[in-house]
Curated annotation (Swiss-Prot):
Domain of life: Eukaryota
Swiss-Prot/TrEMBL GO biological process terms: photosynthesis
Subcellular location: Plastid, Chloroplast thylakoid membrane
The entry's keywords: Chloroplast, Membrane, Photosynthesis, Photosystem II, Plastid, Thylakoid, Transmembrane, Transmembrane helix
Entry's transmembrane regions: 5-25
Family, as annotated: Belongs to the Psb30/Ycf12 family.
Record-given protein name: Photosystem II reaction center protein Psb30
Pfam families tied to this protein: PSII_Ycf12
Topology term for the membrane: Single-pass membrane protein
An annotated GO cellular component: chloroplast thylakoid membrane
Amino acid sequence: MNFEVLFQLTALIFVVAAGPLVIVLLASRSNSGL
């Protein structure tokens, strides 16, 4: 397997997973803050 392709796939998965994760963290932080 090519390392560059594996790196791009890992980066893509990280970006896709980081989107909803950040929203959940912000929502939980705002809820706990209130």
